[in-house]
Amino acid sequence: MKIEGSVALVTGANRGIGKAIATALLDRGAAKVYAAVRDVATVPTDDPRLVPVQLDVTDPAQVRSVADTLGDVEIVVNNAGIGRPATPLTATIDNARAELEVNYLPLLATTQAFAPTLAANGGGAFVNVLSVASWVGMPALATYSASKSAAWSFTNSARVELKHQGTQVVGVHVGFVDTDLTAGLDTDKIPPATVADSVLDALEAGASEAVVDELSRTVKAGLHDDQQLVYPGIEAQFEAARSTPAH
């Protein structure tokens, strides 16, 4: 996917990873980036190529309306996400539902709404910001991990379905990033700009995944091992995150 001259839409583009991706797209020559956020007043206005768009990703009708309006979009970055740290015994149905409604279901809504637009514009790409927690379920992140696992599974299905129309689908796996979600976490974190660079490199390379950091690479490398071998080491790395999700 060529970024220079392209038009992208990034959800949650007013902070953290989303803001970094929007900035990186512009730095690499994107013609326009729609910053899709709940409150457009939170989007900087110093670059005319960055266009605020009001969007609640949990409202499928609003997603469809935005897709119908923005017929020039070629890249859709599904970045918006929330986390409600809890164990299987302390999690609430309401919080688990909220995580699914932000972390998973918007991927379904945006894929259905924007796939025709991307096809009409030459194929384009979807980028779904997932998590290392997509691959491993940890007790303190039980429902968050489940929502990200659902998003990962859907991403894989969408990749197969959309291949016929020439649409690239990139899944982004990353551990601890220096954002609001990890503000209270005392552990090594990577800057959002590092995630953004990895995402855009994957896009331009035609890749299906961006495995951003060492934690994610370690987890992926161990996925084929017996769970009795994988989980002790992974759980130790996640111990510091018992109060804060990775992304």
Where in the sequence are the language-model features?
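Residue(s) in the substrate-gating loop at a strand-loop-helix junction
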Residues: 131
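C-terminal tail/cap regions
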Residues: 188-189, 193-247
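Substrate-binding pocket helix/loop in short-chain dehydrogenase/reductase
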Residues: 87-97
